[in-house]
Amino acid sequence: MPVGFDTSAASSAPASTPAADAPRVSPRSSQRTAVAARRARASRRHPDPWRDADAQTNVDEMARSLEARGRTPAQARLRRRFLKFVPVGSGARVLEVGCGTGVVVRDLAALVGRRGKVVGIDASRRLLDRARALCRETARRTPIALRVADAASLPFAADRFDAALAITVILHVADPLRVVREMARVTRPGGRVGVQDQDFGVVAVTHPDRALTERIMRGVAERVYVEPHSGRRLPGLLRAAGLVDVRLLTDVYQDTTLEPWTKTFLERRAERAVRFGIVDVSTAERWLDGFTEVVAADAFVLTLNYYGAVGTKSA
């Protein structure tokens, strides 16, 4: 039976909803070693599903998870703050790498307006099909183009965009330096390259069994993401790609009530921990029951750090 929160008992936890869930500057040999390590993680028996979404049997659920996360107020605040930090203004031509279902594309369209243009690329045709449907109304007000493309070999001329962004993408990439260099190539001199990622080495959550929580959270992150600690590496990554005036924005997703997106995030951690052999089913269910107890005591807290780095392409 699927691992999930026990909703039969009275609890203050909300009902389940259909939702989801860089190297530093170093000698060239060290960079090659880092890339090789990320590629090895990417080819493990339990690969990152987002690297090849179209090959997954649950891509529709993945699409719903992106939209559910996008609707979460705390996540929307994180995006708005990062886009303001870049910044993105009226009339800008902006590229989003790894646009998924177009959550950020729609945010960008509202910022650039009729005189601007937003281009979104993704490796997944199926996610882009969903994005086209969801962006149809927005595209009547702002020029939007969506296309299948490889982030490591962008199909655009040099100096084409005012800004190129990748939001919660780099942690899924085996060679992030190559991707950021491509983003810089297609950005005009004086334009901005911005990347934002979670860092799964900095997750705090209240639970009666801290050791078990650490084992599950760390074990799943190391098996699912190519680079689970991507967030802390972003400033060095931009500098290694030749960008200047690199700035760092730190932010935190926080939840004190076990919101639907957080609930599903934890359920997925439990399910994957079982699938990867980190814990058995009964242990995973006991772990989730612990959160129900914490919520009932009005003591639940989950925080996940986000890091955003923005650099300028020199003339």
Predicted regions located by residue number:
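N-terminal, positively charged/glycine-rich alpha-helical extensions of SAM-dependent methyltransferases
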Residues: 2-9, 24-64
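Conserved alpha-helix/loop element of class I SAM-dependent methyltransferases that forms part
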Residues: 73-90, 107
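A short acidic, Gly/Pro-enriched loop at the edge of an enzyme's catalytic core
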Residues: 152-163
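A short glycine-rich, Lys/Arg-flanked "PGG" loop and its adjoining helix->strand segment in the class I
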Residues: 177-192
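Conserved catalytic/acceptor-binding region of the Class I
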Residues: 192-259
